């Protein structure tokens, strides 16, 4: 019984001294990197003339989203969208 306890104690000490705990830290840092990438600032790009859109906010500058129901594209607007 004492031999089993001694072996378990030695294995626990070895796992602590060899850096087994650092694997948790690397997992934590990779989870943090993923969170930052997912929640970080999103770069919004706009669509140019003739590119597909779903609303006026998708189009750049004074372009408006217009077209048939199957294909909406950004077009030059002569009046406000």
UniProtKB/Swiss-Prot annotation:
Keyword Secreted set for record: yes
Per the record, the domain of life is: Eukaryota
Signal peptide residues are 1-19
| Pfam families for this protein | Conotoxin
Expression across tissues: Expressed by the venom duct.
- Record GO cellular component, one term: extracellular region
GO MF annotation, one: ion channel inhibitor activity
Name the UniProt key words of this record, in alphabetical order. Answer: Cleavage on pair of basic residues, Disulfide bond, Secreted, Signal, Toxin
Propeptide, residue positions: 20-42
Disulfide topology: 46-60, 53-65, 59-74, 64-81
Does Secreted appear among the keywords?
yes
The listed locations are: Secreted
Q: Which InterPro entries match?
A: Conotoxin
What family name appears in the similarity comment? Answer: Belongs to the conotoxin I3 superfamily.
Q: What's noted about domains in the record? A: The cysteine framework is XI (C-C-CC-CC-C-C).
Question: Which protein are we looking at?
Answer: Conotoxin Pu11.2
Source species of the chain: Conus pulicarius (Flea-bitten cone)
């Amino acid at each position: 019984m004492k031999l089993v306890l001694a072996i378990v104690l030695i294995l626990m000490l070895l796992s602590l001294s060899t850096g087994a705990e650092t694997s948790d830290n690397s997992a934590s840092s990779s989870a943090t990197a993923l969170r930052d990438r997912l929640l970080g600032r999103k770069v919004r790009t706009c669509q140019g003339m003739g590119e597909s859109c779903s609303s006026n906010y998708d189009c750049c500058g004074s372009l408006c989203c217009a077209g048939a129901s199957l294909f909406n594209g950004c077009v030059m607007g002569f009046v406000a969208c």
